[in-house]
Amino acid sequence: MIAASGPTPLVATTQRTLAGTAQWSGVGLHSGQWVALTLQPAAANTGRQFVRLDLEGQPVIPARIEAVKSTQLATELVANGASVRTVEHLLAALAIAGIDNVTIQITGPEVPVLDGSAQPWLEGIQRVGVVPQEAPRPAVILKEPVTIYEGEAFVSAIPAPELRLTYGIDFPYRAIGRQWCSFTPSELATEVAPARTFGFAEQVDYLRSQGLIQGGSLENALVCSASGWVNPPLRFADEPVRHKLLDLWGDLALLGTPPIAHYVAYRASHHLHTQLARAIAQQRV
């Protein structure tokens, strides 16, 4: 359990950080590079930030929407001449745990994929514990609805009395098809964090030829083919859509504290997720 008591972490009234240090290592999904990653407590109002230990000067990359550069099959941040990729699962876990301030030390260009979900991150955070800080967490109100479209795909944020995430997908694979899910913050740790990333067997060779999924394997991603799942069992019957919702929450975490709203997405992508986050950030100006 998370050590700090009181309100649900996502709606806590004060900022939070880690009670200690947590460490992981693993391969990057796209780079295939082995990387070590350490979470360190950070002072109030620091925010979430990456530090590239392997680069001269150890440049800092804020986990903020302003730092987003690329969203091709993952979210990449760039700042101070450095980059870090595939940040969404870790950021989702930090947001689920209610961690506002943390220094993320990393020895390479991509966050390890681990098992393809946010569960290993969340379990490590829970082992260390989370502590409240004296600084208040800002209450962020969505002023008006925001919707971003791209063909049939869309993502929306609608003012609401409580935070809720709803996601829909539709793939021409019998094993997936059309799926919808909807969760509140208190359900994310158990119902969404364990959902793993997924891909399609027919695309593997092409993506690898493009320099992508170099670290992908049947141990860190679900793979779907025309005849069904290559590496069952699934953790949930609708695991793919739950993972897409996890990606959305990780991308919205780039706002720091996302506004209380009902977020609805259909056939969306990291590009649409981050476009929504940018539009919400503009409301704050």
From Swiss-Prot:
User: Is Lipid biosynthesis among the key words of this record?
Assistant: yes
| Cofactor(s) needed for function | Zn(2+)
* Residues the entry annotates as binding Zn(2+): 89, 243, 247
Q: Which InterPro entries does this chain map to?
A: Ribosomal_Su5_D2-typ_SF, UDP-acyl_GlcNac_deAcase, UDP-acyl_GlcNac_deAcase_C, UDP-acyl_N-AcGlcN_deAcase_N
Give this protein's Gene Ontology molecular function annotations: metal ion binding; UDP-3-O-acyl-N-acetylglucosamine deacetylase activity
Recorded GO cellular component terms are: membrane
Keywords assigned by UniProt, alphabetized: Hydrolase, Lipid A biosynthesis, Lipid biosynthesis, Lipid metabolism, Metal-binding, Zinc
Q: What EC number(s) would the UniProt record show?
A: 3.5.1.108
Pathway connected to this protein: Glycolipid biosynthesis; lipid IV(A) biosynthesis; lipid IV(A) from (3R)-3-hydroxytetradecanoyl-[acyl-carrier-protein] and UDP-N-acetyl-alpha-D-glucosamine: step 2/6
Family matches, as Gene3D superfamilies = lpxc deacetylase, domain 1 (3.30.230.20), lpxc deacetylase, domain 2 (3.30.1700.10)
Which residues catalyse the reaction? 270 (proton donor)
Q: Which reaction does it catalyse?
A: a UDP-3-O-[(3R)-3-hydroxyacyl]-N-acetyl-alpha-D-glucosamine + H2O = a UDP-3-O-[(3R)-3-hydroxyacyl]-alpha-D-glucosamine + acetate
**Alphabetically, which GO biological process terms does the record hold?**
lipid A biosynthetic process
Q: Which residues form the signal peptide?
A: none
Cysteine pairs bridged by disulfides in the record: none
Pfam families recorded: LpxC (PF03331)
Q: Which family does it belong to?
A: Belongs to the LpxC family.
Q: Tell me, what does this protein do in biology?
A: Catalyzes the hydrolysis of UDP-3-O-myristoyl-N-acetylglucosamine to form UDP-3-O-myristoylglucosamine and acetate, the committed step in lipid A biosynthesis.
Q: What is this protein called?
A: UDP-3-O-acyl-N-acetylglucosamine deacetylase
The source organism is: Thermosynechococcus vestitus (strain NIES-2133 / IAM M-273 / BP-1)
